[in-house]
Amino acid sequence: MSTKEKLISHVMKEEPVGSRSKVTVVGVGMVGMASAISVLLKDLCDELALVDVMEEKLKGEVMDLQHGSLFLKTHKIVADKDYSVTANSKVVVVTAGARQQEGESRLNLVQRNVNIFKFIIPNIVKYSPNCIIMVVSNPVDILTYVAWKLSGFPRHRVIGSGTNLDSARFRHLMGEKLNIHPSSCHGWIVGEHGDSSVPVWSGVNVAGVSLQGLNPKMGVEGDSENWKAVHKQVVDGAYEVIRLKGYTSWAIGMSVADLVESIIKNLHKVHPVSTLVQGMHGVKDEVFMSIPCVLGNSGLTDVIHMTLKAEEEKQLVTSAETLWGVQKELTL
């Protein structure tokens, strides 16, 4: 008898039980691994799968995570370059793609990453036909559109991480300026995750008190407190982190886990994520951008009708036109 047989007596033959909350992360770069560890530390899945074309790095990353299994509550952590390892995932987080270089706009990344998606998305669909795809790779809005087209999934099951992080940066910077915790500072960044994002100044509030009601010039030229600079810091934030450390990882990883939690736990929380906005707020083209959306177990269940000022709506349409200008040139 083996040591195991001497130690353990089976009471019953265990039937294989499928995963109820399996999460897959495609791409084990800095963002992928930050997303993976954030999901693990929030105890969001009963199985985590990692996929990448770089076999050595993939093997090293999964071993490193497995060695910490004692400190986690996720029973199974697996990895392979073959997409069969992702089978029956509830949520598939796509972080793979060419990395954004210092000074490079997210939109410049687009065609390189479209070609990568032509391989990734069909494989996800093959093994997890009922999953929710969450796109994180940049430019996220255009690549969410690409994933939607390539997958054939309904729009509620293809979500972009969008401006969830931009809004978190915005609230952090508001908190710094007011000396209040970010969770008590309420404000939304919508539109493109990137240079043409739109701060909804008319909705910024603390404890229900409209800050624009206190300072009507907030967010516009001539504001002595220069709140407009806060949005500029949001836009420049990622570029500055890339300049300083070479890449972004921790904040986007935590943002991904925040979104995954709302889906897995069916929280019905409202997040600014990238979805199809054609026909809303004056947007005519088939583009994906961030607006406040409700996330639950079925994916993106509802969109919130924002009350925007004319100037904010105009900026949102301009943001959509910026995305469409690039998107219409794509070869899918």
From Swiss-Prot:
One Gene Ontology cellular component term attached to this UniProt record is: cytoplasm
Oxidoreductase is among the record's keywords: yes
Q: Which UniProt keywords apply?
A: Cytoplasm, NAD, Oxidoreductase
Report the EC number(s), separated by commas if there are several.
1.1.1.27
The record's annotation in PROSITE patterns points to: L_LDH
Residues the entry annotates as binding substrate: R106, N138, R169, T248
Q: In which pathway does it act?
A: Fermentation; pyruvate fermentation to lactate; (S)-lactate from pyruvate: step 1/1
Q: Name one GO biological process term.
A: lactate metabolic process
Q: Where in the cell is it found?
A: Cytoplasm
Whether Membrane counts among this entry's keywords is no
Q: What's an example of a GO molecular-function annotation for this chain?
A: L-lactate dehydrogenase activity
Under catalytic activity, the entry for this protein gives: (S)-lactate + NAD(+) = pyruvate + NADH + H(+)
Q: Which domain of life is it from?
A: Eukaryota
| InterPro entries recorded | L-lactate/malate_DH, L-lactate_DH, L-lactate_DH_AS, Lactate/malate_DH_C, Lactate/malate_DH_N, Lactate_DH/Glyco_Ohase_4_C, NAD(P)-bd_dom_sf
Q: CDD domains annotated for this entry?
A: LDH_1
Residues that coordinate or bind NAD(+): 29-57, 99, 138
Role of this protein: Interconverts simultaneously and stereospecifically pyruvate and lactate with concomitant interconversion of NADH and NAD(+).
Could you tell me which PANTHER family the record lists for this protein? L-2-HYDROXYCARBOXYLATE DEHYDROGENASE (NAD(P)(+)), L-LACTATE DEHYDROGENASE A CHAIN
Q: Which family does it belong to?
A: Belongs to the LDH/MDH superfamily. LDH family.
Outline the subunit composition.
Homotetramer.
Q: State the protein's name.
A: L-lactate dehydrogenase A chain
Task: Give the organism the record lists.
Answer: Lycodichthys dearborni (Antarctic eelpout)
